[in-house]
Curated annotation (Swiss-Prot):
Membership in a protein family: Belongs to the protein kinase superfamily. Ser/Thr protein kinase family.
Cellular location(s): Cell membrane
Pfam entry (one): LRRNT_2
Extracellular topological segments: 30-238
Record GO cellular component, one term: plasma membrane
Role: Involved in the signaling pathway that regulates cell wall function, including cellulose biosynthesis, likely via an 1-aminocyclopropane-1-carboxylic acid (ACC)-mediated signal (a precursor of ethylene).
Keyword Cell membrane belongs to the record: yes
Protein name as annotated: LRR receptor-like serine/threonine-protein kinase FEI 1
Keyword terms: ATP-binding, Cell membrane, Glycoprotein, Kinase, Leucine-rich repeat, Membrane, Nucleotide-binding, Phosphoprotein, Receptor, Repeat, Serine/threonine-protein kinase, Signal, Transferase, Transmembrane, Transmembrane helix
Residue positions binding ATP: 312-320, 334
Gene3D superfamilies assigned to the protein according to its UniProt record, in alphabetical order: Phosphorylase Kinase, domain 1, Ribonuclease Inhibitor, Transferase(Phosphotransferase) domain 1
EC class of the enzyme, as a word: transferase
Catalytic residues as annotated in Swiss-Prot or TrEMBL: 429 (proton acceptor)
Length: 591
């Protein structure tokens, strides 16, 4: 009898323990929000380590990187994963985050369609998907988000029309679909009618009053929905380059370029023959907004006639040729070898955007030739060559006024990229060989956008390979992440190069274990900063020099926060260098 009781007691304890274990396991089960986030993580093919911390072993997603939860409900309300090199599709399970208010996935490498399930996240107030590679149509279901206030899908490869349902978003105050492949008439009803042209530019096949393009019906006549009496216009709005992280391998391109230059020097006409064969093997010409008044046949014929005498340079992005047309106009042709066919679509899209950017102090991209193995970029040809050549390779010396004007021109070009483009453009490779000069020695910034286009995952390494080591900001060397302030640092180095007439890593600096920035700091400590100036520079004005040294010193500050913006730099140049007042820089350095 006692045995039976003991058995019953034992079974009761086992049942209780089993129940407690079951309850314990249930309490540790991951939440539905966590499961949705893990679905997203599992879809990612590549990223930095930011979301590696998301693990099913940690059942509380509120502790995960980039995730914020409501304190009471413990539901996910914010997902912020910007600038983390995330590559992969956005899975439909994202729609299960029905308490989500803020979705920030911009500046990554997400691709594929935007899931229609996003329309299930009815608590959303802000969606930021810009600067990715999303394709396909904009889901009409996004019009089912009653609380949505901000929607940014700019700088992707979205196609199709803009859904009319978005006009129902009564709280929408910020809307941007610029720089995509959207087509058709922009909905004129509802909230979308209140947004400006900047929300839609960069979509060449959109029409409507927002972009000053009259819509046509199927017969080719102006649509009855368009304003009467308005002539059809081409969309002349500026296409703005994305800060999107395009796939590329600058290291590979640089090595190919150097190898191409080696072949040119050692094997003579081998590269030229391959270029002629490449162009003759099925090339097509893309012109931007009628900038090239020539037929494709005429241009290809000229390309086939290029020989080794037309090579005028070989840099980090490719070999450069001088191309003369029959009407006397001259262009610079930059040859960039293709990386892979999948890269073409994004590359061509970015080239189209670059080709639309026009400014007095920028080198214009007129079009390109798409050949089987390379892209041939057609730029304006500037007879003055590069600033690097003017400073270091020619017999004649630049006088003071010329140097100051070059500095101001370069500053204005870079300031335009930083402050007058949306999204802002980071050059990433400011150096003297990327500052070109016209016949009057007026400066123009070249190669903007290419460093980002061909960016390798280890971008700081590829830039060093390209020969710009002396221009890199210290934080860029450490992190590889470029910002406007890394450009400002490079500009400060450029100013010192122009003033000294020496390259940033001149042998005279290296012997002392310094570069031009270190040399300036040494001279300041010795209370003789003016000694940095090229002794062969004629017409120097001391007050302007002191102002320039002060600006350069601010630009090359070790702390990015202490560097001025390029807009501020231009203001200082115009107020203190062009019309100098007595400077305190030299006095403060001489105390």
């Amino acid at each position: 009898m006692m045995g039976i009781c003991e058995m019953k007691s034992c079974c009761s304890w086992l049942l209780l323990i089993s129940l407690l274990c079951s309850l314990s396991n249930e309490s540790q089960a991951i939440s539905p929000d966590g499961e949705a986030l893990l679905s997203f993580r599992n879809a990612v093919t590549r990223s930095d380590s930011f979301i590696h911390q998301w693990r099913p072993e940690d059942p509380d997603p509120c502790n995960w990187n980039g995730v914020t939860c409501d304190a009471k409900t413990k539901r996910v309300i914010t997902l912020n994963l910007t600038y983390h090199k995330i590559m992969g599709p956005l899975p439909p399970d994202i729609g299960k985050l029905d308490h989500l208010r803020l979705l920030m996935l911009h500046n990554n490498a997400l691709y594929g369609a935007i899931p229609t399930a996003l329309g299930n996240c009815t608590a959303l107030e802000e969606i930021h998907l810009q600067s990715n590679y999303f394709t396909g149509p904009i889901p009409a279901e996004m019009g089912d988000l009653p609380g949505l206030q901000k929607l940014d899908m700019s700088s992707n490869t979205l196609s199709g029309p803009i859904p009319a349902s978005l006009g129902q978003l009564k709280k929408l105050s910020n809307f941007n679909v610029s720089n995509n492949f959207l087509v058709g008439q922009i909905p004129s009803d509802g909230v979308l009618s209140g947004f400006s042209k900047n929300s839609f530019i960069g979509n060449l096949n959109l029409c409507g009053k927002h972009v000053d393009v009259v819509c046509q019906d199927d017969s080719g006549n102006p649509s009855s929905h368009s304003q009467s009496g308005q002539n059809q216009k081409k969309n002349s709005g500026k296409l703005l380059i994305s800060a999107s992280a395009t796939v590329g391998a600058l290291l590979l391109v640089a090595l190919m370029c150097f190898w191409g230059c080696f072949l040119y020097k050692k094997l003579g006409k081998v590269e030229i023959k391959s270029l002629a064969k490449d162009v003759g093997g099925g090339a097509s010409i893309v012109m931007f907004h009628g900038d090239l008044p020539y037929s494709s046949k005429d241009i290809i014929k000229k390309l086939e006639m290029l020989n080794e005498e037309h090579i005028i340079g070989c840099g980090g992005f490719g070999t450069v040729y001088k191309l003369a047309m029959d009407d006397g106009k001259v262009f610079a042709l930059k040859r960039i070898l293709k990386l892979n066919e999948g890269f073409d679509r994004f590359f061509e899209r970015e080239l189209e955007i670059l080709g639309s950017i026009k400014h007095r102090y920028l080198v214009n991209l007129r079009g390109y030739c798409n050949s089987p193995t390379s892209k041939l970029l057609l730029y304006d040809y500037l007879p003055g060559g590069s600033l690097d050549e003017a400073l270091h390779e020619r017999g004649e010396q630049l006088d003071w006024d010329s140097r100051v004007n070059i500095i101001i021109g370069a500053a204005k070009g870079l300031s335009y990229l930083h402050h007058d483009c949306s999204p802002r453009i980071i050059h990433r490779d400011i150096k003297s060989s990327n500052i070109l000069l016209d016949g009057n020695l007026e400066a123009r910034v070249s190669d903007f956008g290419l460093a980002k286009l061909l960016e390798d995952e280890e971008s700081h390494i590829t830039t060093i390979v390209a020969g710009t080591f002396g221009y890199l900001a210290p934080e860029y060397m450490q992190s590889g992440r470029a910002t406007e302030k890394t450009d400002v640092y490079s500009f400060g180095v450029l100013v010192l190069e122009v003033l000294s007439g020496k390259r940033p890593t001149d042998a005279s600096f290296i012997e002392k274990g310094l570069n031009v920035v270190g040399w300036l700091k040494f001279l300041i400590s010795e209370k003789r900063p003016r000694d940095i100036v090229d002794p062969n520079c004629e017409g120097m004005q001391m007050e302007s020099l002191d102002a320039l040294l002060s600006i350069a010193t601010q630009c090359v500050s070790p702390s990015p926060e202490e560097r001025p913006t390029m807009h501020r730099v231009v203001q200082l140049l115009e107020s203190e260098v062009m019309t100098p007042c007595p400077s305190e820089f030299y006095d403060s350095s001489s105390d």
